[in-house]
Amino acid sequence: MKRYHFIYNILLMAVMGISLSACDDYLTIYPQDRIIDENFWEDRNDLEGMRYGAYTQLGQQLQKLIIWGDLRSDAYLINPQNNSNQGQRSTYNKILEAQLDSTLTCYDWGGVYTAINYCNQVLENGEEVLARDAQFTRTEWNQMKAEITALRSLCYFYLIRSFKDIAYSNKVITSDTEIMQFEPTKQLEVLNILINDVEAIKGQARNRYTDNRDTKGLITNTAIYALLADMYLWRSALLEGRANQGAVDLKVSNTAGHADAQKVLDYGQAAIDALFLQNQQIGASSGHATGLTLKDFGCTGVVNNVQLIANEDMKGNYAANQVVSVPSFREIYNNGNSVESMFELQFSLSDYRGNGGIVTHFWGSSTTSHLGANNNAFLVAEGNNTDKFNKDCRTWYTCNNNYSGTGSTSTSTPYYNFKWSLCLFNKSGDNVLPKTYWSEDSEVAYQNWIIYRLTDVLLMMAEAHAVLSTAEDDAHIQAARTIIDAVHKRSHIDQDGTTASITKNSDKSRDRLLELVMNERLLEFAGEGKRWFDLVRYAERIGGGSNPDPRDPDVTDGSEGVNKMIDLFMAQGNSAMVSTWKSRMKNRWGLYGPIYFTEMKANGKVSPGVYRFPQNPVWNRDQQW
């Protein structure tokens, strides 16, 4: 790790100094009259400087990744406590109400393209460095190539989930002239490219590094398999939704996405196997906390090698009306790089690399926090069962109105998300919901940001099983229920008891299991930048509608999926907004963000009033030039 941070903090500054004097175009990271000299690529240190630069650049986009992947979802409301320190309150409220337009700077995707260009630099110059540096081996280059190919694919994957059709290039961009050559590439076409790219390098990255922070903070084989599972899950949804025309019955299996759903199961298991091996190789003495109990909560036979952090003392602490120990919360969020982690962006107080206070910018109950938690959505996810809501430890830190903490100005008791705060949970007296004592000290600004972890992959597999179901209560339905219950049990105070399950014997149909997966993902990943993406995928899988897609007339516009997603999830606690959301989103294009107006300007026009890179047809409210 010392070598990593030496390169990270010294070489990276040199790379940044060379490359970040950018012109104002969204893909250009070098000034027009200056590109990196060919002599820059002398040895592996030059490659590694650019390699770590890509990770840093992606980490600097964290606020946008949260807005794109989470903000619009059913998990949040604008903070009920209005404060002048909430500088983005008006903007975020517009986004929550689906009032998107191309002048919102949060939809500027340029920073992600900069990370992509760093990846392209590494991939384009690796062979040259290999030829020049005798100490740099072919094996090391192949591992780095696999890692950076996956990182580039992850960046593009964020973009197609956020904007649908995007500009795609696997070449280094160095000038404005090259920008003018770009036209949009369709979402599904880009996804096909990404899957093929990652398929070509799977299993070729490193399994682990000497330091656990590198193992969890750089892309390894377990992260690559998780990424493949995620991309196949999305492609299965896109294919299924485009095969659905008119009115859609989710109880009826649509086989268009079945092959990809099976791939989710294959690569999900591969990711979990790789994580299991990785953790064995690391060992408790080399980075992981000792004294943890790991359980599979009934997964074996459906998914193998599952090791979830158990909260064994939670039930006894709760019954004794005392401070409740929640090791899963402590290890996954407060400490980071847990045994369940597959890939997380690293932030470190010792290296002065913070997350910019982004997590407290969105969550918590301080004066600067912009969001409250939508308790109605969480209650529905718990089966409208208040007892389950109170006894699921995840609600204690993602949707709690019984709290006390530093920085809180609340005089009432709205619900907030404290996932990224330092929390202590105290069950006292007759209070059924433990009181959360939270703090946002300096360490919070240096907590890692999790991209993939074990329960994420497990619930991808549960969704894939639901997709593959062809009859009520078949083996796939039973497998999906087993996985959902395993994830749920870990966080319920009863743990292995019968009351800890969330599914019921009556949950036998494909559409019901897809709904249950979405509910469990809300409970598990609220505040982790995933919820809106999940809802988009759900809507895309349904598709349907009576009108043609505005950009692809061979398929319908997906409006039925949009409407069902709003009715089933977004409406919880927001019934007054339902008709407005449906009117504003219109069709599947309304699920995605607008193209930032300066990026359209950079691409120019093909004729008066016609941009080379057209605006999202739902958010077609642009400044004109």
Per-region residue spans from a language model:
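Short coil/linker segments at helix-helix boundaries
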Residues: D165-Q187, L238-D266
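Short coil/turn linking the two alpha-helices of tandem helical-hairpin repeats
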Residues: I160-A167, W234-A243, V467-E472
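Bacterial N-terminal signal peptides that target proteins for export
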Residues: K2-L11
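Bacterial signal peptide processing site
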Residues: D24-L27
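Conserved, well-structured interaction surfaces
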Residues: R44-Q61, I66, N83-F163, E178-K216, ...
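C-terminal motif of bacterial Sec signal peptides marking the signal peptidase cleavage site
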Residues: S19-A22
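Extended amphipathic alpha-helical segments enriched in small hydrophobics
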Residues: R152-S153, L228-A229, Y446-D494
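Elongated scaffold/linker segments in the mid-to-C-terminal portions of large proteins
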Residues: E42-D46, R51, Y55, G59-L62, ...
